[in-house]
Amino acid sequence: MKRYFIHTFGCQMNVNDSLRMSEVLSQMSYAPTPVPDNADLIILNTCSIREKAEDKMLSALGRYKPVKASRGALIGVGGCVAQQEKDKLLKKVPYLDFVFGPDNIARLPDIIGRVSAERERVVETAFVNSEEYVFPRADPETSRGKVTEFVTVMKGCDNVCSFCIVPHTRGREVSRAFPDVLVEVADLAKVGVREVTLIGQNVNSYAGGISFAQLLLRTAEVPGIERVRFTTSHPHDLSDELIEAFRVQPKITPHFHLPVQCGSDRILKMMRRDYTVVQYLERLAKLREARPGIAVTTDIIVGFPGETEEEFEMTMQLTEQVRYDNQFSFVYSPRPKTGAALREKDWGPVPHEVKIARLERLQKLQRRISGEITAALVGSEVEVMVEGHSRYDATKRFGRTPENRTVNFDGDAPAGSFVTVKVERATPNQLAGKQVALLKPPTVEPLPVPMAEAPFHVVAEA
């Protein structure tokens, strides 16, 4: 049997796409391998949100070149870099066999067949017409024994933020019909999945026959589902209806990832974000009033063209004011075809060393805030959904709180259980403690394997 290895870069959408790739390959009688040197097929599922991710991809391709020389392995590149660069990648990497975009995962059998039979180098990056697009869905049998799963509800983005390449690599917004979403969720619940994460580039603008708030509420009503998460959201589309859903349905987890990007109204306007800092804070205040204790995380870009020291300080002040539970912060990276990249010289590029210094200051501030938030939980008891053995110590269990905080703990509850854990230690990014009570057993017999890791054939990195 031929074996495959998938190397994933970037966001949860890419992780989900890689899982769908693995299902397609399994149907082709490929088996996964955790060792790329043993693979007959290597796929890099790429991210182009930052230049650094592209550099990592090219570095990884270089590492996999000897596998092609020794085993004759096929090497393909999928994801957003593939969509962006198309046939340029074949010219840049002579040993690359095929390139395919996010819309073309279902065509992998044809692509691989053409490469194998005809030794043809293939590029498939056409966006599928919205009426013809078939959303990837998890195979319930593949998901059997898992306790958490992604469910795609939409793709693409109609916002044109000046820093973002996603509209060019993922296309226009297309929403999945809500009955199809609910059928997939129900199928997953029947095989033991207890938490689903509804994903899309901008889920708040979902338009699959009902509003996104209504979709969340209906998903929470599916028998067997205990937790409903989602990502990613745009502050401009955070509606009162969605906030009310957090108030009335406890299964919608108290965690909201709400990317602010920066703390300056002038920069937000240049970014084309369509909200001000005051408007963002007003939405956030309503959310916290509706769901006290909700964990809020964010994305921040440092060193956007034209950002002054005073404007960076506004971002620092906003971080201190909001007290995010965590944040994903990066230096600005110009992306092809984006408005900011085209106007960077006019707006004034921020020197690299200034970007790095600002990022280090911001991340230091966030580590302090995150540490204060988690330290306050020491001595308390938290609810944890057990996902399996800890990746750090196989004698311990691993899971997450409703607020999406990682917990490693002493206990014996199987994956899929809900337990109470007394928090004994905390770092800015995780909690540790011991199990003190079993709240709910799993709904199906758990698999006798660790669940804390991603599937071993999908190696993910940012």
From Swiss-Prot:
Q: Which Gene3D superfamilies match?
A: Methylthiotransferase, N-terminal domain, tm_1862 like domain
EC numbers? 2.8.4.3
The UniProt entry, under Pfam families, shows: Radical_SAM, TRAM, UPF0004
Q: Which cofactor does it need?
A: [4Fe-4S] cluster
Q: Where is the Radical SAM core domain?
A: 143-372
Q: Which reaction does it catalyse?
A: N(6)-dimethylallyladenosine(37) in tRNA + (sulfur carrier)-SH + AH2 + 2 S-adenosyl-L-methionine = 2-methylsulfanyl-N(6)-dimethylallyladenosine(37) in tRNA + (sulfur carrier)-H + 5'-deoxyadenosine + L-methionine + A + S-adenosyl-L-homocysteine + 2 H(+)
Q: Does the keyword Iron apply?
A: yes
> In this protein, which residues make up the domain named TRAM?
375-437
* Protein keywords: 4Fe-4S, Cytoplasm, Iron, Iron-sulfur, Metal-binding, S-adenosyl-L-methionine, Transferase, tRNA processing
Free-text cofactor note: Binds 2 [4Fe-4S] clusters. One cluster is coordinated with 3 cysteines and an exchangeable S-adenosyl-L-methionine.
GO terms for CC?
cytosol
Binding-site residues, [4Fe-4S] cluster 1? 11, 47, 80
Task: Fill in the subunit field for this protein.
Answer: Monomer.
Mind telling me what this protein is named?
Answer: tRNA-2-methylthio-N(6)-dimethylallyladenosine synthase
